[in-house]
Design a protein with these regions (language model features):
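The feature marks the mature, well-folded catalytic cores of soluble enzymes
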Residues: 1-141
Length: 141
């Protein structure tokens, strides 16, 4: 793609992201995370496999002004605090499927209505350490 999508805050550095974007000649789209529970972008944001660039996200995890970086790229769909705490955004996308960490997540119905296939993988033991589905995956491309 033409963009580097990233976040900084508790565990990441904005300058490092800008440097990486420059090295690969990408436009940086970087947001600031402000909630320590959501320490990486994949804990509070997930791009969905739809034609409209839909993405679920937890608004309270982000500095309000930095969300403007994403508003021109994504149709942002907020998740509730309850869903965020269940790490709904830490789902995994494979083709047209979205794998959620629990079936007790309200946003699942909305995501299904967008045309995504829904899969559930119970990772409740991993949730105790602050991670879910995406934290258990290494993507190879």
């Amino acid at each position: 793609g033409e963009y580097l999508i990233g976040s900084y805050g508790v565990r990441s550095d904005k300058e490092a992201l800008i440097y990486i974007a420059e090295q690969f000649e990408l436009k940086p789209k970087i947001v600031k995370l402000v909630d320590e529970k959501f320490y990486h972008l994949d804990t509070c944001f997930q791009n969905l496999p739809t034609n409209n660039n839909d993405a679920i996200f937890y608004p309270e995890a982000f500095e309000d002004s930095s969300l403007n970086e994403f508003s021109d790229l994504f149709n942002l769909i907020p998740v509730s605090e309850n869903d965020a705490n269940k790490l709904a955004c830490n789902s995994v996308v494979i083709n047209e499927s979205v794998i959620f960490p629990s079936d007790d997540i309200d946003i699942i119905e909305t995501v299904a209505d967008l045309g995504c296939n829904i899969e559930i993988s119970d990772v409740s033991e991993f949730l105790k350490s602050g991670g879910a589905c995406q934290c258990l995956v290494i993507t190879l491309q």
